[in-house]
Design a protein with these regions (language model features):
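N-terminal membrane-entry
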Residues: 28-40
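A broad "ordered helical/assembly scaffold" signature
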Residues: 3-4, 32, 236
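Soluble extramembrane regions of membrane proteins in the secretory/endomembrane system
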Residues: 1-27
Length: 298
């Protein structure tokens, strides 16, 4: 009775029923994964050059060596090679997005969307490397979720803190230590919330998610909507975006953007719509927050 009732409900909803058949095996040729790998390691070398401009030869040779290792691994253990390349892309492109030429744009809008486009390029590389039947049906999946959420933040903080090394030899007020402790606790909470088996979601957040899904069909990700993208707006409207301390928060949105496309079993159109909603509404929330702050100062 249960199966008959379920079948009737599915048919009323517009679904057709029939005999279950296995998916045909499909995998792109290794050459396409190799091309994607070359692009990923080129981006990694470019970011390394930005971090260490006086180590140009080392950065370039490191990129070539990493690509060679990836090609060998692609022949020996193709799934591991794909997962490794996708992880590198998920780490590098959010960082690269916040170090790009878009900062030289004159308007906040162009700066904002330039960063998003670099991250979308990273998402494209993730999709290219994670293609294949076993990944599409989730028999295998993206590995390194927590690394992809932590390493970009650490790299962005490193780039901002490098000019401040002299502070290590100075007396630090207690209030700064308290702020650092609170930031550390927030970081622990952030890491524990990542992945499929993190901290449980609060009931209020569940209700908010359901409301957005009913309203928009696909809800934007919370980290992008309420945290990352508004922070990106704040950073991009500053006089020196590349030095803004909003960037460690802004990169969370770029990480989440790329991470959306690691869920390769999800329809690409759904991931694109979700990303667009997050970028649009995040920008609007950032703009509204600035206007509210300016109004409050008056």
């Amino acid at each position: 009775d249960l199966l008959e009732t379920l079948q009737a409900r599915l048919e009323r909803a517009g679904f057709s029923t029939g005999r279950a058949r296995p998916f045909a095996s499909w995998n792109p040729g290794w050459i396409w994964t190799a091309v994607a790998g070359a692009g990923i390691w080129a981006a990694a070398a470019l970011y390394a050059l930005d971090l260490f401009p006086h180590r140009a030869v080392l950065c370039l040779w490191g990129g070539f060596l990493a690509l060679a290792v990836s090609l060998v691994l692609l022949m020996v253990a193709p799934l591991l090679a794909k997962q490794g390349l996708a992880l590198v892309a998920a780490i590098i492109f959010p960082c690269l997005a916040l170090r790009g030429a878009g900062f030289r744009a004159k308007t906040t809008l162009w700066r904002y969307w330039s960063c998003a486009l670099v991250s979308m390029l990273g998402a494209l590389f993730v999709v290219a490397t994670l293609s294949g039947t076993e990944l599409l049906v989730k028999l295998q999946e993206f590995r390194g979720v927590k690394l992809a959420h932590v390493i970009p933040i650490a790299l962005v903080v490193y780039t901002l803190a490098r000019p401040l090394r002299d502070w290590l030899n100075k007396d630090v007020p207690i209030r700064y230590l308290i702020i650092a402790a609170l930031v550390g606790l927030a970081g622990v909470f952030y890491v524990l919330r990542t992945g499929n088996f993190g901290l449980p979601v609060m009931n209020l957040e569940v209700q908010a998610r359901e409301f957005l899904e009913n309203l928009l069909f696909v809800r934007p990700r919370t980290k992008e909507l309420l945290l990352g993208h508004p922070a990106l707006y704040f950073a991009m409207r500053s006089r020196q975006p590349h030095k803004s301390w909003w960037l460690p928060v802004a990169v969370i949105g770029q990480i989440s953007l790329v991470n959306t496309f690691t869920h390769i079993h999800t329809f690409l159109s759904v991931s694109l719509l979700r990303t667009l909603y997050g970028l649009l509404f995040g920008y609007v929330l950032g703009w509204l927050a600035v206007k509210a702050f300016d109004w409050g100062k008056r």
